[in-house]
């Protein structure tokens, strides 16, 4: 037989799960244990003491002969006579009188013991009558027959419920126990419950929860008591805060919403280092991540809720079933029973009267069991009422939001909501503390504290570098926010914030008086009102790199003193048909607009800044730019770059830009430039860059663009240079590198103002002597050609500072290179063996640049 502890273990759950057991579940668990005890007690009693005792019902005599009076002399007859009489009675006599014997043991013994001996003297008949004969009735059954009939009548005469009540009660109780805790055992729900309880316990014990709640208490108290200074209020609200000499807590803090009197700054900045150490901070940040993932995992289903409802319905149905059939058997349990086993051929009797010694005990236990199951059932009905009375698949933290400063705690749904409702039945404080870890404001505060603890002023100083413009630059990458110490770097010129989604710029940025350039790379920074006012007046250059237009902060379009704006991101996806630059008209001082995207047309909104825009750059990343009409309105643009726009011809809209000075059409598909004659109307055009295209020839009409000073045709398919190019007397820079040019015309000598000539990567084999008449040349790149000799007249280029000859077919260098006094070894790009062919004095002259810095430094 099993013990009570072994069966009761079915009702056991992990101690940590008790927070998910409301009072009715606990009460039903105890009732189940009581029912289990009743069932086991009844079963034990039945196995050890359950007996049925039966006696035959003897027939009554029908006449006086059939019955011998107790004092009759026939009673004293010998045993054989009595046996014969007994046999005679068994064969044919019937009677209506029923008598019960006093013994169920062997009938021979009482017969010999109860009848008087026949050798007594009978002198006095009266004395004999005073000594009564035994009144019991003889059955003449032996012991085995009684055992047999007791067993037969136990199974035939007793109601089945009297025999199986303990076992049925035990089975019903076990089913109820399993039903009560099935949601703790079923794998698909058990895993979620276990995870929830684990996270809930950690959130409850986390120091960050205590700190956050203390901050909330301080903030609420300060809002109600604005009359108290920080030195008086801080010891009252923050028992673990810093020393009494801390700054006043009533100092107003300016944020995005305006002025706010609170003890927030002392509570966050000073006590955070003592209340929340680095280890606790890391654990709290891990908890936020766990809560976020658990919410996403649990909120998408309601399996736990449905399973709890199903098991409650099963328990209720079980209660109704038990109550209905059990109540019918209460009256069926009785002490006396009549048994007709139909074994006359074995026993000689047809009817037996039986007694059940456990009847009264079983009846009382059954009534007790019914009473307990009724209480159990009423609790089940109450549970169903609770389940369907309120929407348990929705949980609102409205009360927590009202009591705390975390107004962003979201409402939850489905299984997450149901678990929180169950926890509320245990202790609502768990949900309140758990809600802190659902708040983004709380998480941001934690990140801010940890961030400021890690990124101190000294550490930020070590990360400052100087950029190409010799400005102090700080680059912060993938942080949880912007450390407060950044805004103490008052001499910083450039600030780069990359991949910081929660970046906030406080009013302290007004201390950075040297800050003029800001980079926001995938960083939709939020600014406070005071910070915005400072940026609006002082910021000159802004770089914004984004994936979606929504990442461009709205305040960017309101920086009235901004001079340069760089926008890099996708502006032509399915969600971004038009660039969101509606507010560019507020950028009254914008001079340079750089857009690197994938536009199909020039946004019309750019015309809002047309009156003062001087430079427009569009890098289109290979997307074909189809509509360029908006360019016609940009009359003041001096520099225009349309790179990688898949243009096949020079856009006609460009010819309307009368103030255009520099045009860059790099990396397009331009094959012909017959429209170049129209550039003669652009009187100020001095630089034309048509490099990295597919241009085959330069039309002679280029001679009409007389003001050109720089001409770039590198990386095209040119095979020759037209004479018209050399009629551009103002030309200072000519770049025809990486083409198929095989000859340099002798007319090149006409370019008396030429300073930079690039012919690298062509097929030139001979250098005309007229080339060296361009005595103003400073840069001459002739690498990767087929040149076999360098004319001695190269010595006429006295201003030459860079000469590239590498990759040719030269066998020596002329000694006249020594006459190029501005040329040094660092500016001479040539193979080492060719350099060694120079005379020693020439090599020494070229190497003087190595010693000059040392001489200057002494």
From Swiss-Prot:
<dbReference type="GO" id="GO:0034214">
    <property type="term" value="P:protein hexamerization"/>
</dbReference>
<keyword id="KW-0597">Phosphoprotein</keyword>
<feature type="repeat" description="LRR 8">
    <location>
        <begin position="684"/>
        <end position="705"/>
    </location>
</feature>
<feature type="transmembrane region" description="Helical; Name=2">
    <location>
        <begin position="164"/>
        <end position="182"/>
    </location>
</feature>
<feature type="repeat" description="LRR 9">
    <location>
        <begin position="707"/>
        <end position="728"/>
    </location>
</feature>
<feature type="modified residue" description="Phosphoserine">
    <location>
        <position position="242"/>
    </location>
</feature>
<comment type="function">
    <text>Non-essential component of the volume-regulated anion channel (VRAC, also named VSOAC channel), an anion channel required to maintain a constant cell volume in response to extracellular or intracellular osmotic changes. The VRAC channel conducts iodide better than chloride and can also conduct organic osmolytes like taurine. Plays a redundant role in the efflux of amino acids, such as aspartate, in response to osmotic stress. LRRC8A and LRRC8D are required for the uptake of the drug cisplatin.</text>
</comment>
<dbReference type="Pfam" id="PF12534">
    <property type="entry name" value="Pannexin_like"/>
</dbReference>
<comment type="subunit">
    <text>Heterohexamer; oligomerizes with other LRRC8 proteins (LRRC8A, LRRC8B, LRRC8C and/or LRRC8E) to form a heterohexamer. In vivo, the subunit composition may depend primarily on expression levels, and heterooligomeric channels containing various proportions of the different LRRC8 proteins may coexist.</text>
</comment>
<protein>
    <recommendedName>
        <fullName>Volume-regulated anion channel subunit LRRC8D</fullName>
    </recommendedName>
</protein>
<dbReference type="GO" id="GO:0098656">
    <property type="term" value="P:monoatomic anion transmembrane transport"/>
</dbReference>
<keyword id="KW-1133">Transmembrane helix</keyword>
<dbReference type="GO" id="GO:0005225">
    <property type="term" value="F:volume-sensitive anion channel activity"/>
</dbReference>
<keyword id="KW-0812">Transmembrane</keyword>
<keyword id="KW-0433">Leucine-rich repeat</keyword>
<keyword id="KW-0256">Endoplasmic reticulum</keyword>
<feature type="disulfide bond">
    <location>
        <begin position="54"/>
        <end position="354"/>
    </location>
</feature>
<feature type="topological domain" description="Cytoplasmic">
    <location>
        <begin position="387"/>
        <end position="858"/>
    </location>
</feature>
<feature type="topological domain" description="Extracellular">
    <location>
        <begin position="329"/>
        <end position="360"/>
    </location>
</feature>
<dbReference type="Pfam" id="PF13855">
    <property type="entry name" value="LRR_8"/>
</dbReference>
<keyword id="KW-0677">Repeat</keyword>
<feature type="repeat" description="LRR 2">
    <location>
        <begin position="538"/>
        <end position="559"/>
    </location>
</feature>
<feature type="topological domain" description="Extracellular">
    <location>
        <begin position="49"/>
        <end position="163"/>
    </location>
</feature>
<dbReference type="GO" id="GO:0034702">
    <property type="term" value="C:monoatomic ion channel complex"/>
</dbReference>
<dbReference type="InterPro" id="IPR032675">
    <property type="entry name" value="LRR_dom_sf"/>
</dbReference>
<keyword id="KW-0407">Ion channel</keyword>
<feature type="transmembrane region" description="Helical; Name=3">
    <location>
        <begin position="309"/>
        <end position="328"/>
    </location>
</feature>
<dbReference type="GO" id="GO:0015734">
    <property type="term" value="P:taurine transmembrane transport"/>
</dbReference>
<feature type="transmembrane region" description="Helical; Name=1">
    <location>
        <begin position="23"/>
        <end position="48"/>
    </location>
</feature>
<keyword id="KW-0406">Ion transport</keyword>
<feature type="repeat" description="LRR 10">
    <location>
        <begin position="730"/>
        <end position="751"/>
    </location>
</feature>
<dbReference type="InterPro" id="IPR050216">
    <property type="entry name" value="LRR_domain-containing"/>
</dbReference>
<comment type="similarity">
    <text>Belongs to the LRRC8 family.</text>
</comment>
<feature type="repeat" description="LRR 1">
    <location>
        <begin position="514"/>
        <end position="534"/>
    </location>
</feature>
<keyword id="KW-1015">Disulfide bond</keyword>
<feature type="topological domain" description="Cytoplasmic">
    <location>
        <begin position="1"/>
        <end position="22"/>
    </location>
</feature>
<dbReference type="GO" id="GO:0015810">
    <property type="term" value="P:aspartate transmembrane transport"/>
</dbReference>
<feature type="topological domain" description="Cytoplasmic">
    <location>
        <begin position="183"/>
        <end position="308"/>
    </location>
</feature>
<feature type="repeat" description="LRR 5">
    <location>
        <begin position="612"/>
        <end position="632"/>
    </location>
</feature>
<dbReference type="GO" id="GO:0001678">
    <property type="term" value="P:intracellular glucose homeostasis"/>
</dbReference>
<keyword id="KW-1003">Cell membrane</keyword>
<dbReference type="InterPro" id="IPR021040">
    <property type="entry name" value="LRRC8_Pannexin-like"/>
</dbReference>
């Amino acid at each position: 037989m099993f013990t009570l502890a072994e069966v009761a273990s079915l009702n056991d759950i992990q101690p940590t799960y008790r927070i998910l057991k409301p009072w009715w579940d606990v009460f039903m668990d105890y009732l189940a244990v009581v029912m289990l005890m009743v069932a086991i007690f009844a079963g034990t009693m039945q196995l050890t003491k359950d007996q049925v005792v039966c006696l035959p019902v003897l027939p009554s005599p029908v006449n006086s002969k059939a019955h011998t009076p107790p004092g009759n002399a026939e009673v004293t007859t010998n045993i054989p006579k009595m046996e014969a009489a007994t046999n005679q009675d068994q064969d044919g006599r019937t009677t209506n009188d029923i008598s019960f014997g006093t013994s169920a043991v062997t009938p021979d013994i009482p017969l010999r013991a109860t009848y008087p001996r026949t050798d007594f003297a009978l002198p006095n008949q009266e004395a004999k009558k005073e000594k009564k004969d035994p009144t019991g009735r003889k059955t003449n059954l032996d012991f085995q027959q009684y055992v047999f009939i007791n067993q037969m009548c136990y199974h035939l005469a007793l109601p089945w419920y009297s025999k199986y009540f303990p076992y049925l009660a035990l089975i019903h109780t076990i089913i109820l126990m399993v039903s009560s805790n099935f949601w703790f055992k079923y794998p698909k729900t058990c895993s979620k419950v276990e995870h929830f309880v684990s996270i809930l316990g950690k959130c409850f014990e986390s120091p960050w929860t205590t700190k956050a709640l203390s901050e909330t208490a301080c903030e609420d108290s300060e809002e109600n008591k604005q009359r108290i200074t920080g030195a008086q209020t801080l010891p009252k609200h923050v028992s673990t805060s810093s020393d009494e000499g801390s700054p006043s807590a009533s100092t107003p803090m300016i944020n995005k919403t305006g002025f706010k009197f609170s003890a927030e700054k002392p509570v966050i900045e000073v006590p955070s280092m003592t209340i929340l150490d680095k280890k606790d901070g890391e654990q709290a940040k891990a908890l936020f991540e766990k809560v976020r993932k658990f919410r996403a995992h649990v909120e998408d289903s309601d399996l736990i809720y449905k399973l709890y409802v199903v098991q409650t319905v099963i328990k209720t149905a079980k209660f109704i079933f038990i109550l209905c059939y059990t109540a019918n058997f209460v009256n069926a349990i009785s002490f006396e029973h009549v048994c007709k086993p139909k074994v006359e051929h074995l026993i000689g009797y047809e009817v037996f009267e039986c007694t059940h010694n456990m009847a009264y005990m079983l009846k009382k236990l059954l009534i007790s069991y019914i009473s307990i199951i009724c209480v159990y059932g009423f609790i089940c009905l109450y549970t169903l009422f609770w389940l369907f009375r309120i929407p348990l698949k929705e949980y609102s933290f409205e009360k927590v939001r009202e009591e705390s400063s975390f107004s962003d705690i979201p409402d939850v749904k489905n299984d997450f909501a149901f678990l929180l409702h169950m926890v509320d039945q245990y202790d609502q404080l768990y949900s309140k503390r758990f809600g802190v870890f659902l708040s983004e404001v709380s998480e941001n505060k934690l990140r801010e504290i940890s961030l400021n603890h890690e990124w101190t002023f000294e550490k930020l100083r070590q990360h400052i570098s100087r950029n190409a413009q010799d400005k102090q630059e700080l680059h912060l990458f993938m942080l949880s926010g912007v450390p407060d110490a950044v805004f103490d770097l008052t001499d910083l010129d450039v600030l780069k914030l990359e991949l910081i989604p929660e970046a906030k710029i406080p009013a302290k940025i007004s201390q950075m008086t040297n800050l003029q350039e800001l980079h926001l790379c995938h960083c939709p920074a939020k600014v406070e009102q005071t910070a915005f006012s400072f940026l609006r007046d002082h910021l000159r250059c802004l770089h914004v790199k984004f994936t979606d237009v929504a990442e461009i902060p709205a305040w960017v379009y309101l920086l009235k003193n901004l001079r340069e704006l760089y926008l890099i991101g996708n502006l032509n996806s399915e969600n971004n048909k038009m660039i969101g630059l509606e507010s560019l008209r507020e950028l009254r001082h914008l001079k340079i607009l750089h857009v690197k995207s994938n536009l199909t047309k020039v946004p019309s909104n750019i015309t809002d800044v047309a009156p003062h825009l001087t430079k427009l750059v569009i890098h289109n990343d290979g997307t074909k730019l189809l509509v360029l009409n908006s360019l016609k309105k940009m009359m003041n643009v001096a520099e225009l770059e349309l790179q990688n726009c898949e243009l096949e011809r020079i856009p006609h809209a460009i010819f309307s830009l009368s103030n255009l000075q520099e045009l860059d059409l790099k990396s397009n598909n331009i094959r012909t430039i017959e429209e170049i004659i129209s550039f003669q109307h652009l009187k100020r055009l001095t630089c034309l860059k048509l490099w990295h295209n597919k241009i085959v020839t330069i039309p002679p009409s280029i001679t009409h663009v007389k003001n050109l000073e720089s001409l770039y045709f590198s990386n095209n398919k040119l095979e020759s240079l037209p004479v018209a190019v050399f009629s551009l007397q103002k030309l200072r820079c000519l770049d025809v590198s990486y083409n198929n040019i095989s000859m340099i015309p002798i007319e090149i000598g006409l370019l008396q103002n030429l300073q930079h000539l690039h012919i690298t990567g062509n097929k030139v084999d001979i250098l005309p002597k007229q080339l060296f008449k361009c005595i103003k040349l400073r840069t001459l790149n002739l690498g990767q050609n087929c040149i076999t000799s360098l004319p001695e007249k190269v010595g006429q280029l006295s201003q030459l500072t860079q000469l590239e000859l590498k990759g040719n077919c030269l066998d020596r260098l002329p000694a006249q290179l020594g006459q190029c006094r501005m040329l040094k070894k660092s500016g001479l790009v040539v193979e080492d063996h060719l350099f060694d062919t120079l005379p020693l004095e020439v090599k020494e002259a070229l190497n003087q640049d190595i010693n000059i810095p040392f001489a200057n430094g002494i």
